[in-house]
Amino acid sequence: MSRFPRLSETFVLGEILAVEEQGVDVELFPLLRERADVVHPEAAALAERARFQPFVSVPILRSHVHFLRRSPRRYAGALWALLRGTWGSANYFAGALGIFPKVVHQARAMEAEGVDHVHCHFSNHPAAAGFLIGRLTDIPYSFTAHGFDLHVDRRMLCEKVAGAAFVITISEYNRRLIVEECGGPARAKLAVIHCGVDTGLFRPREASPPERPFSILCVGTLHEVKGQGYLVEACRLLAEAGIDVRCTLVGDGPDRAALARQVASAGLGDRVDLVGRRTRAGVAELLARAHVLVAPSVPTKEGKREGIPVALMEAMACGVPVVASDLSGIPELVDDGATGLLVPPRDPEALASALRRL
């Protein structure tokens, strides 16, 4: 994975724990350490044994010498494939060069310790790491493609798919996208496996919340792709219509200051709360008091899109009604009018109308 332990990536944490429950030894090789003030307790324990590496060190240099001596052709071929595949995208190229030294070191460590298989989360730099490890060693790799990683930059995607033992994606929408990009041969390597939910933690609540005020919950990184600004505008429309509404925005991120200004400008300081990050247990507690969970996702100007927000699955597991954008793989989870309500992205009026319907 790119970073660990990341609060928002509960789907990665849940998968690690579930695989370990099956008796499989899991070793973690994150590309970067995530520095956060709130961490899931289970992730904190895993981080204690994760293999974090600096970008450059003497052991890393020794690993490069090891592969250069053993098979200069494989080493040069792996580096050339990375440079050729990422050329033309400044961000991807710089990121790929940045991780190359430590990935070579990780490859040597995995080989020395008898790692049988490498699985990577996200089809961008983590999958590139798996691709490199596969080129340097005989260890097979696979990866999971989620959402934004397939939309912003697909460089090397088809090379990664071709080299992988298999590829998991979290929606039929993503599967179709990969087949369109890489052609029919990719179809045989693809499996759709939706992200899971801890139903021991997220389970039907014992009692409904009080009828008033109408309580709206939104969980996710405060980022343009999550569309929280459109929910704030929908809350303004509901308040103008005389509806006693309270909205709780869970998460943190680059849009926090802008959202706080929007809330203040709309006069919603007593109706919309930005409460910051919460653990999985904290989100479960908030769901117990919510009338609805909203996922107002939007495509960004750069083309970034969500896959299927895990917060939607968690809410539905708790029996909480959901309203979400009709986007990407979300309609595979939310059957409009049956298991939830779907609205067009970037449409606060439609969002407010759906919330009034509830």
Which functions belong to the PLM regions below?
Residues 333-337, 341-348, 357-358:
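Conserved acidic donor-binding segment of nucleotide-sugar-dependent glycosyltransferases
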